[in-house]
UniProtKB/Swiss-Prot annotation:
Protein name: Vacuolar protein sorting-associated protein 4B
Matching CDD domains: MIT_VPS4, RecA-like_VPS4
A Gene Ontology biological process term: vacuole organization
Comment, domains: The MIT domain serves as an adapter for ESCRT-III proteins. It forms an asymmetric three-helix bundle that binds amphipathic MIM (MIT interacting motif) helices along the groove between MIT helices 2 and 3 present in a subset of ESCRT-III proteins thus establishing the canonical MIM-MIT interaction. In an extended conformation along the groove between helices 1 and 3, also binds to a type-2 MIT interacting motif (MIM2).
Molecular-function GO terms, alphabetical: ATP binding; ATP hydrolysis activity
Catalytic activity: ATP + H2O = ADP + phosphate + H(+)
Chain residues that bind ATP: 174-181
Gene3D superfamilies xrefs: 1.10.8.60, P-loop containing nucleotide triphosphate hydrolases, Phosphotransferase system, lactose/cellobiose-type IIA subunit
Subcellular location: Late endosome membrane
Length: 444
């Protein structure tokens, strides 16, 4: 390279500082600095170094620093168990001479393992989400499969003995906004004896070299210690996409660790269910896809499920909609996902507020008192048209805070919001999902 790039200079500075800390006996600080320096060196090799000779030289330096980092790691690991003479730079550590015992009894006292497990503790859902099966409209096939995989083995363990074993991996796939994550919340609520781990890719990806796969390993270790347990990985495609020549070494290592932990030789996953969710299942690595024994398509809701969603999202809000109105809304929203319907209802719930804001006239009506809803009063004010009998010219600013009676949500509010909200799922994605279902999945 003609001149030293900022990244290369940073790597050199870090390595120099690491060597100083190493000589001073500050081994923990030195280890962090060596690892950090290697990250910068690898970045330079990948994106900045010109010519094979420069790359070869940097790689050789990296190997040297990594070897030293490993020796320091071994020393720090054994430090708590026995007083041991610090290793001089360039000398082999006692762990090299006596054999690596990191897989033996000392692993439970491994400070690094504890740190990684503490990092994952936040992923354990301690408070159960309050989502019942009845709160999930439609998706009967998916609900039955999840009950079969999660609820039945906990309630009737004697049913699942011998060759009859519960499912260990279930993949929920489908268009965005169809309730995949919501179903996982229902599982967490209903499986009240299970430990529920809700994981996203950010929980498992680390900037430090080699730490991401350790996080994956420790996640499964935590799940085994707290079984029966459910590991829910949202947007699993971001962690386990198809392997290619262009992917980074870190991504490949995460994938390999997932494969080993989900069903590797000598791995005991009894009592552990891995639940994955994705909108783009065709990008998943084929080996990862095979680990998910059940692949359930979560489709766009049917008309009856859409009608039920309108009802669920309205909740206890005052409205004038009839059963026939809900059925009509279900028919009019073909191609809309559950999330789209949620947005329509939220917008419709704001329509009465907009009427209050834009009203130029209000009239007095009878209604429940704000102080005591069981007591009716005659001096509440509600928006009206200027021609209404008893209309008083005023704006919402003139209405006392406890005297406003907002209009109820009506069918016309729903239709107005529906006309302003377009579906978020396109036909092209639906065709790809349908093809994937035909090839690898089952209908939910």
């Amino acid at each position: 390279m003609s001149s030293t790039s900022p990244n290369l200079q940073k790597a050199i500075d870090l390595a120099s500082k690491a060597a100083q800390e190493d000589k001073a006996g500050n081994y923990e600080e030195a280890l962090q600095l060596y690892q950090h320096a290697v990250q910068y060196f690898l970045h330079v090799v990948k994106y900045e170094a010109q010519g094979d000779k420069a790359k070869q030289s940097i790689r050789a330096q990296c190997t040297e620093y990594l070897d030293r980092a490993e020796k320091l790691k071994e020393y720090l690991k054994n430090k708590e168990k026995k007083a041991q003479k610090p290793v001089k730079e360039g000398q082999p550590s006692p762990a090299d001479e006596k054999g690596n015992d990191s897989d033996g009894e000392g692993e439970s006292d491994d400070p690094e393992k504890k740190k990684l497990q503490n990092q994952l503790q936040g992923a354990i859902v301690i408070e159960r989400p309050n989502v019942k099966w009845s709160d999930v409209a439609g998706l009967e096939g998916a609900k039955e499969a999840l009950k079969e995989a999660v609820i039945l083995p906990i309630k009737f363990p004697h049913l699942f003995t011998g060759k009859r074993t519960p499912w260990r991996g279930i993949l929920l796939f489908g268009p965005p906004g169809t309730g995949k994550s919501y179903l996982a919340k229902a599982v967490a609520t209903e499986a009240n004896n299970s430990t529920f781990f809700s994981i996203s890719s950010s929980d498992l990806v680390s900037k430090w070299l080699g730490e991401s796969e350790k996080l994956v390993k420790n996640l499964f270790q935590l799940a085994r210690e707290n079984k029966p347990s459910i590991i829910f990985i949202d947007e699993i495609d971001s962690l386990c996409g198809s392997r290619s020549e262009n992917e980074s070494e870190a991504a490949r290592r995460i994938k390999t660790e997932f494969l080993v932990q989900m069903r590797g030789v000598g791995v005991d996953n009894d009592g552990i269910l891995v639940l994955g969710a994705t909108n783009i299942p065709w990008v998943l690595d084929s080996a990862i896809r095979r680990r998910f024994e059940k692949r359930i398509y979560i489709p766009l809701p049917e008309p009856h499920a859409r009608a039920a969603m309108f009802k669920l999202h309205l909740g206890t809000t005052q409205n004038s909609l009839t059963e026939a109105d809900f059925r009509e809304l279900g028919r009019k929203t073909d191609g809309y996902s559950g999330a789209d319907i949620s947005i329509i209802v939220r917008d419709a719930l704001m329509q009465p507020v907009r009427k209050v804001q834009s009203a130029t006239h209000f009239k007095k009506v009878r209604g429940p008192s704000r102080a005591d809803p069981n007591h009716l009063v005659d001096d509440l004010l509600t928006p009206c048209s200027p021609g209404d009998p008893g209309a008083i010219e005023m704006t919402w600013m003139d209405v006392p805070g406890d005297k406003l009676l907002e209009p109820v949500v009506s069918m016309s509010d729903m239709l107005r919001s529906l006309s302003n909200t377009k579906p978020t799922v396109n036909e092209h994605d639906l065709l790809k999902l349908k093809k994937f279902t035909e090839d690898f999945g089952q209908e939910g």
